[in-house]
Amino acid sequence: MASFVDRVVLHVSGGTGGHGCVSVKREKFKPLGGPDGGNGGNGGDVILRVSAQTTTLLDYHHAPHRHATNGGPGMGDWRGGKNGETLILPVPDGTVVKTKDGEVLADLVGEGTEYIAAAGGQGGLGNASLSSQKRRAPGFALLGIEGESSDIVLELKSIADIALVGFPSAGKSSLIAAMSAARPKIADYPFTTLIPNLGVVQAGDVRFTIADVPGLIEGASEGKGLGHNFLRHVERCAALVHVLDCGTLESDRDPLSDLAIIEAELEKYAVDMSYAGVDGEVVPLNERPKLVVLNKVDLPDGKDMAEFVRPDLEARGYRVFEVSATSHEGLRQLGFAMAEIVQAARNAVQAAPPKVAPPVLRPRAVNESGFKIRREEKNLEPLFRVLGEKPVRWVKQTDFTNEEAIGYLADRLAKLGVETELFKVGAKPGDTVVIGEDDGVVFDWEPTMMAGAELLATPRGTDIRVADIGDRPTRSQKRDEQIERREAKAAARAELEAERKAGIWTESVSGRRAQAVKESHLDSGDDD
């Protein structure tokens, strides 16, 4: 089973925002107190964070699908939904985030560095937040938006000061085991090392790391052998150390030809290097400091081969060291030479002026207000596609089972200028309008009543039950009405008394007439 993974495809999804709530306040003596629906909670983000405790991408190889939690729905009494929890994914130092097409999204270097791989969706507004002076009691709320989903590629580039490069079985693993406490797998067959091994070396007061890169062969820059799988691990090192095998038994190999092949492969690979590190542009591989190590001088023919090729290598400008990983011959001098190069590189970084932070490679749209309309043809009929961050987001927030919510969407689109722009591009009533890409929402466009929004029985954002509350009579109005009823009743009694005295009707008729008048007043709600 693999214990080291340096490249994975990760499928990440942010949490979906919670829906807003539609609710009307109810309490004693105030049965309809206005809208009180709370907002939905935002969905959780998926964040990649550099952790010193993580050295491999193995966990994501076994579980590549990661999803943050959703936001909670809004509730009545102005209670908002709970925000989804942020999902933190620890990654090793030196992880590069790319798209499947190879576009670099982020280069994560340094403890605590973060990158939002998938943002959570926005929670929907409740009807309390949607109310205004003109829209006093909305009978709808906005829906929560789904979180971002993306497939990203994580590639680990080892963080080491020195990289050991060379042909398979050149003795790189033996060298790192002899110079540090690392214990890589060592055997007498090619490609024993299948993963980069890191070791820490102490030379005097300087402490640095060296990386044992798996063996390279001719054509590695084009993917042969282990190819690009491990060439990327040399990109961040301050210097390269060529480990040449002086004891090889292969007739077509010698230290000089091995060096020429490795140099050619590194130069070809350097042409494709185009990422920017935290300290600026990376120095090309062929321009970095190099040391040449003639290994296996403890073998009978190894010492002779080293003495034979050393003058030629020194004439080319290389610093050459004859060593033996088995007997530890020459390792002390080699360690101090490495420390000298590492210290010089660190001093150069400290002396360099502070640099401006690198630009964001793919900035996220923030409150983008623009939109565009694209005319298309479908089944020989015109189709107008509306594209833009705001229109697409508004459509996702709309509950299309609620006519009032559809009308609210129509108002927002008209205010943004979508209707005016449709006229300009030649849209006619009845034409098909799509908001969004292939999965967009389809409308039969009518300029004065988009999607039937104007067919509502009441103005958008009103509730008859709540609206009637404002039309109820005041106390003074009730008092005036009561006085008018009493005066009308007194006038009716006086009229009856005048008729009785004039002898128009008898006492029995008067009694029945008075009883009828009394019952009529009781029916009208008079308490007297």
Swiss-Prot record:
Cofactor: Mg(2+)
Pfam families, A to Z: DUF1967 (PF09269), GTP1_OBG (PF01018), MMR_HSR1 (PF01926)
Gene (name only): obg
Matching InterPro entries: G_OBG, GTP-bd, GTP-bd_Obg/CgtA, GTP-bd_prot_GTP1/OBG_C_sf, GTP1-OBG_CS, GTP1_OBG_dom, GTP1_OBG_dom_sf, OBG_GTPase
Known partners and oligomeric status: Monomer.
CDD domains assigned to the protein according to its UniProt record, in alphabetical order: Obg
GO BP term, example: ribosome biogenesis
Similarity annotation: Belongs to the TRAFAC class OBG-HflX-like GTPase superfamily. OBG GTPase family.
GO CC terms: cytoplasm
Record-listed GTP binding positions: 166-173, 191-195, 212-215, 295-298, 324-326
Span list, region Disordered: 471-490
Location in or out of the cell: Cytoplasm
Stretches assigned to the OCT domain: 363-447
HAMAP family, sorted: GTPase_Obg
OBG-type G domain location: 160-343
Main subcellular localisation: cytoplasm
Function: An essential GTPase which binds GTP, GDP and possibly (p)ppGpp with moderate affinity, with high nucleotide exchange rates and a fairly low GTP hydrolysis rate. Plays a role in control of the cell cycle, stress response, ribosome biogenesis and in those bacteria that undergo differentiation, in morphogenesis control.
UniProt-recorded name of the protein: GTPase Obg
UniProt EC number: 3.6.5.-
Binding, Mg(2+): S173, T193
Record domain Obg: where: 2-159
GO-annotated molecular function: GTP binding; GTPase activity; magnesium ion binding
